[in-house]
Design a protein with these regions (language model features):
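Conserved phosphate/anionic-ligand binding catalytic regions in large, soluble enzymes, centered on
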Residues: 33-37, 179-201, 300-312, 316, ...
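Iron-sulfur cluster-binding cysteine motifs and their immediate structural context
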Residues: 74-79, 480-486, 564, 574-593, ...
């Protein structure tokens, strides 16, 4: 790998890479993200390698193993360029057909194309699929185009040009001024203005200074940061380099969640390549700026995503938060000024420097600028990563991009912001997605988790789940969080078991406010949000559990009963065969019935009943 010592070297290198890429008439990209790996995309890639070698097409066709394009519901994903043909749910057996028909003859394979159920037609290009069409993909635009393990691919797309501009054409103060003017706010949850944070760190007394990338993404169902770091690690490194130059830091750390092996591997590969290319180390691009980066594996706890706990973890200590009266920008790693941003925040920096703050601030709303990546999961047809401009409505994300309800049940709510966020009812789906609007609704932006729930979801059970999760993840350092969440969990357990009484909801609310007001760190202060928002919008559901001893969503096992409709039952016997407690009785070809005293309420009978005769009440 060549050593880049100047902007001219960088430009010449890019020209050489682009010239080499010109020899390929066709490019095949195979998604190699964690989601598609669960669908055995590695085997699909190997099948392409074997088939291309067999057809002696290696010199004319480039095969790229890329990051996540976002449409995780449909993996493995394969795209053929320059035709821009998008194939989904590709299997190993499909590969020879793709090579012979699409690559060699330019023909589309119908059964691999996405089908728009509303329009009743096949769509060959990803950009015309509703899931992608309503998005504004700025940060994710290269995820499905580059091999994250090859710095050359990133350089070919203009990579490290923003770094060159910052180092050679701007002063540190000018970089900070540009970031402040862009209106970029931290994408990790707090929404603090990024430029102001950088300025505070630069002005803080003490040396050396540090920059940290937080990829300890612990929200259930969230994978935005993981996918960015897996798919385009050099964009994060470039952002960190620019930030370090602006702040005056010489050392950085990428803190990666322990459960993210591919993200850690690709980040380390990118760091090694950047060092060999002279883009990390001493005298970067001949500018006299020195900076290096190390990776650090997360401590495995959700609370390690909190800034002060993360700092402690990097230092080799137990990942416990400390009081917020001391900020990491003044006293962070080893007591020195430290600027900590999450993956998505760092990835925005090269875009802002390249395109300008005026361009960036033209996207979004008055107080929430740019785009935001969300992890759209739950009861929608299309799940995956979505990048949208700030200000888009929840309805547009859930129905236009997500495709609406998954199995015909009406959508009831969406939970945003992870365990610290809130549940927003369908009646508020016209709400714009920005920092202020979500906060006013009792939720938060958070890092970008978005869980869609339908009528089959019990909101009491949802509140109980998040309280239980946060109780387990609490460091236990402060009493309000440790004991308060434990007691809240006990109250919610009682309600779902039919043991709630007239005082349960009042006590639950009182405890929630105490935990929020008295806890030491952000985890405890925001932990009651799911409970408070569920009570605010779905109180009748809680009251039904307490007063009527019924679960309207038929989820809470102690409050439901299984029965068989005499009119609908065909007497096939499928239910009796799968019942683990032999609670189903009845003669063949005659209506069956369930013995309530034996029924374990496992739901197996309902799962196998083709006549839909099993009822839950």
């Amino acid at each position: 790998m060549r050593k880049i010592k100047s902007i001219r070297d960088l430009e010449n290198w890019r020209d050489e890479i682009l010239a080499r890429q010109q020899q390929y008439k066709t490019v095949i990209t195979v998604c190699g993200g964690t989601g598609c790996q669960a669908y055995h995309c590695q085997e699909v890639k190997k099948a392409f390698q074997k088939e291309l070698a067999k057809e002696k097409m290696g010199e004319r066709v480039s095969l790229k193993y890329t990051g996540c394009p976002g449409f995780c519901e449909r993996g493995p994903l394969v795209t053929i360029f320059p035709q821009d043909i998008f194939y989904q749910r590709v299997k190993v057996k499909d590969v020879p057909l793709i090579v012979s028909e699409t690559v060699q003859r330019g023909k589309k394979i119908d059964h691999l194309l996405f089908e728009d159920e509303r329009a009743h037609k096949k769509i060959p290009s990803a950009r015309d699929i509703p899931f992608y069409r309503a998005q504004m993909r700025l940060l994710l635009s290269n995820n499905d185009l580059i091999d994250p393990t090859r710095v050359e691919d990133y350089v070919a797309k203009g990579g490290y040009q923003s770094l060159a501009k910052a180092l050679l054409q701007m002063t540190p103060s000018e970089v900070i001024k540009e970031v402040k003017a862009s209106g970029l706010k931290g994408r990790g949850g707090a929404g603090y203005p990024t430029g102001k944070k950088w300025e505070n760190c630069r002005n803080a007394p003490g040396a050396p200074k540090y920059v940290v990338c937080n990829c300890d993404e612990g929200d259930p169902g969230a994978f935005m940061d993981r996918s960015l770091l897996e798919g385009n690690p050099h964009s994060i490194l470039e952002g960190m380099l620019i930030g370090a130059y602006a702040i005056g830091a010489s050392q950085g750390f990428v803190y990666v969640r322990h459960e993210y092996p591919l993200a850690h591997k690709n980040a380390q590969t990118a760091i090694n390549q950047a060092r060999r290319a002279g883009l990390l180390g001493q005298n970067i691009l001949g500018s006299s700026f020195d900076f290096d980066v190390e990776t650090a594996k997360g401590g495995g706890a959700f609370v390690c995503g909190e800034s002060t706990a993360l700092i402690a973890s990097i230092e080799g200590k137990v990942g416990e938060p400390r009081g917020k009266q001391i900020h990491t920008v003044t006293q962070g790693l080893w007591g020195k000024p430290t600027n900590l941003n999450n993956v998505e925040t760092w990835a925005n920096i090269p875009l802002i420097i390249r395109q300008g703050s005026e361009w960036f601030s033209s996207i979004g709303t008055e107080k929430s600028k740019g785009t935001k990546i969300f992890s759209l999961v739950g009861k929608v047809k299309n799940t995956g990563l979505v990048e949208v401009p700030m200000g888009i409505t929840l309805k547009e994300i859930i129905y236009d991009i997500g495709g609406g309800p998954q199995d015909g049940k009406a959508i009831k709510a969406v939970q945003t912001g992870g365990p610290s966020g809130g549940c927003i009812p369908a009646s508020l789906f016209e709400l714009p997605v920005d920092f202020d609007s979500l906060s006013r609704a009792g939720s938060m932006m958070g890092s970008g988790g978005m869980i869609v729930m339908d009528e089959g979801t019990c909101m009491v059970d949802v509140a109980r789940y998040f309280v239980r999760f946060l109780k387990e993840e609490s460091c236990g350092k402060c009493l309000p969080c440790r004991e308060g969440l434990k007691r809240m969990g006990e109250i919610l357990d009682g309600i779902t078991e039919g043991k709630g009484n007239g005082e349960s909801l009042g006590l639950l609310e009182e405890l929630a406010h105490v935990v929020a007001d008295a806890s030491l760190c952000g985890l405890g202060k925001t932990a009651p949000n799911p409970v408070l928002s569920a009570l605010r919008y779905f109180r009748p559901e809680f009251e039904a559990h307490i007063q009527q001893k019924k679960c309207p969503a038929a989820v809470c096992t102690p409050l439901i009963q299984y029965s068989i409709s005499e009119r609908s039952c065909t007497g096939c016997g499928a239910c009796s065969k799968v019942c683990p407690t032999h609670a189903v009785e009845g003669e063949k070809k005659q209506s069956h019935r369930i013995l309530a005293q034996l029924c374990s309420k496992c739901g197996s009978c309902k799962d196998v009943c083709k006549a839909n005769a099993v009822m839950v009440q």
